[in-house]
């Protein structure tokens, strides 16, 4: 059985090649928080968080650092550890950045216990390893038609994808319909198109 030793975080901010142009924000940089959870037995569980806003990194890191005291020398038991972390935040609240911090450490715990069992996490949880269909969603935000057409072709070619995803949510729904037509024309009938309308 693994026991908790320490959790550390490292913050990085990436400059996006294609900024995110959503209804609610224009994002040029992407924050990532790397999490390393060390056990007394030498196994390291890893995870990462992508909290959207760079300044949130310091708040989440601070919460995660507090979990060192909460979990010190505790056996790694994902469900029990999750509850301990969550309960330690009772007066702060169980949502937003606090639960994001809990989730990051929770993923690192699952990574550590599956490594200790010498299994991929999906197998440790009862699943199987196999091919997974993937699509490219690394673009196609709320851009104009000429940009969308060029980006759509690039996304398909980037990894020989058979499906891509675009975002909707323009002020006028007719502009969304035109954007869909533009992308469909650019990618042809052999590539599937998915959409997000979440802005």
Residue ranges and their predicted role:
Residues 1-46, 50-52:
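Structured beta-strand/loop patches that form or line metal/cofactor-binding pockets in enzymes
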Residues 31-33, 65, 132:
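Residues at beta-strand starts and edge strands
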Residues 127-199:
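Metal-dependent enolase-superfamily TIM-barrel catalytic cores that perform enediolate-based chemistry
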Residues 6, 38-116:
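Metal- or metallocofactor-binding catalytic centers and their adjacent structured scaffolds
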Residues 6, 83-84, 122-127, 136, ...:
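Beta-strand segments within the central parallel beta-sheet cores of soluble alpha/beta enzyme folds
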Residues 106-142:
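Glycine-rich, aromatic-flanked loop segments that form ligand/cofactor-binding clefts
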């Amino acid at each position: 059985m693994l026991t908790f030793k320490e959790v550390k975080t490292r913050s990085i901010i990436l400059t996006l090649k294609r900024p995110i142009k959503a209804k609610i924000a224009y994002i040029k940089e992407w924050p990532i928080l790397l999490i390393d959870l060390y056990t007394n037995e030498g196994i390291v569980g890893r995870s990462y968080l992508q909290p959207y806003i760079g300044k949130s990194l310091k708040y989440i890191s601070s919460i995660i650092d507090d979990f060192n005291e909460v979990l010190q020398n505790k056996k790694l038991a994902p469900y029990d550890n999750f509850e301990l972390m969550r309960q330690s935040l009772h007066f702060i609240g169980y949502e937003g950045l606090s639960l994001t911090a809990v989730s990051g450490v929770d993923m690192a715990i699952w990574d550590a216990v599956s490594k200790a069992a010498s299994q991929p996490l999906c197998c440790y949880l009862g699943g199987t390893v196999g091919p997974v269909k993937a699509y490219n969603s690394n673009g196609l935000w709320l851009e104009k038609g000429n940009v969308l057409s060029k980006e759509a072709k690039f996304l398909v070619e980037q990894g020989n994808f058979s499906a891509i995803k675009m975002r909707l949510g323009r002020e006028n729904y007719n502009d969304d319909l035109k954007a869909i037509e533009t992308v469909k024309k650019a990618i042809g009938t052999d590539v599937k198109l998915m959409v997000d309308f979440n802005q």
